[in-house]
Amino acid sequence: MKPKKEIRPKLDTDRIDDAVLALMYLTLHDGGRAWKGFDWETTNRLFKKGLISDPVSKAKSVWLSHEAQARSKQLFEQMFVVKEN
C-alpha cells in the first residue's frame, strides 16, 4: 500500500514574506544588515522583490534596502508591539 501523500494548504507567501521581514527588524545591525537565518525560499522571494541583497553568499547576513528597512519596522510594530490604551 502506498503511503498517503500529505496535502498542504495553499500558503499566502506575501504574508510569510511580511512576517520574515518584520522578524528581520529584530536583528538589524551595521546600518541595514540583518541575519539571514530564515527559510531559503522566503529569502529568495525577498531578494527577487528587491528588498534584500542576494542571500546566496557566505555572509551570515543580508543587506536590507532603505524601503525594506522602513517596511520591516512598520511590519514589526504592526505585528508584534502591544498597543497601550
Regions found by a protein language model. Give the residues of each.
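Short amphipathic alpha-helical interaction segments
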Residues: G32-K49
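Short, amphipathic alpha-helical interaction segments positioned at domain boundaries
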Residues: H66-N85
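N-terminal acidic leader/helix
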Residues: P3-G37
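A short, conserved structural fragment
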Residues: K48-S57
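Minor-groove-contacting beta-hairpin "wing" of winged helix-turn-helix DNA-binding domains
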Residues: A59-S65
